[in-house]
């Protein structure tokens, strides 16, 4: 088998319908667009969200909330992922090196999810109460 000899199985592909090519094709004359009206004209599409002149729903409803910019550079790391980090200390740089958080992350928080079997020192990361207990139970400690 060669790349240049690959072909779909016979009957697997059907040829596309050519519109406006005679009555016998089933898509002649109007080409499947029906008679008259905006959508039958060329360029006659209606933009998404347009409701025929009625005030659109995205303008009828009030604005609310905002997107936190800090949330974009914050990551959550669970205990099972911390166990994958090489070495005894876990900090933002080691998490990035292990590929557990993206490069643009500035803040990280350790959450209690999964198991931690070895002692690690967590530096400069926020830690939830449950995760703190699990780290200390495994013989680890939390610094700053």
UniProtKB/Swiss-Prot annotation:
<dbReference type="InterPro" id="IPR021131">
    <property type="entry name" value="Ribosomal_uL15/eL18"/>
</dbReference>
<protein>
    <recommendedName>
        <fullName>Large ribosomal subunit protein uL15</fullName>
    </recommendedName>
</protein>
<dbReference type="InterPro" id="IPR005749">
    <property type="entry name" value="Ribosomal_uL15_bac-type"/>
</dbReference>
<dbReference type="Pfam" id="PF00828">
    <property type="entry name" value="Ribosomal_L27A"/>
</dbReference>
<comment type="function">
    <text>Binds to the 23S rRNA.</text>
</comment>
<dbReference type="InterPro" id="IPR036227">
    <property type="entry name" value="Ribosomal_uL15/eL18_sf"/>
</dbReference>
<comment type="subunit">
    <text>Part of the 50S ribosomal subunit.</text>
</comment>
<keyword id="KW-0689">Ribosomal protein</keyword>
<comment type="similarity">
    <text>Belongs to the universal ribosomal protein uL15 family.</text>
</comment>
<dbReference type="GO" id="GO:0022625">
    <property type="term" value="C:cytosolic large ribosomal subunit"/>
</dbReference>
<keyword id="KW-0694">RNA-binding</keyword>
<dbReference type="GO" id="GO:0019843">
    <property type="term" value="F:rRNA binding"/>
</dbReference>
<keyword id="KW-0699">rRNA-binding</keyword>
<dbReference type="GO" id="GO:0003735">
    <property type="term" value="F:structural constituent of ribosome"/>
</dbReference>
<dbReference type="InterPro" id="IPR030878">
    <property type="entry name" value="Ribosomal_uL15"/>
</dbReference>
<feature type="region of interest" description="Disordered">
    <location>
        <begin position="1"/>
        <end position="56"/>
    </location>
</feature>
<feature type="compositionally biased region" description="Gly residues">
    <location>
        <begin position="21"/>
        <end position="31"/>
    </location>
</feature>
<keyword id="KW-0687">Ribonucleoprotein</keyword>
<dbReference type="GO" id="GO:0006412">
    <property type="term" value="P:translation"/>
</dbReference>
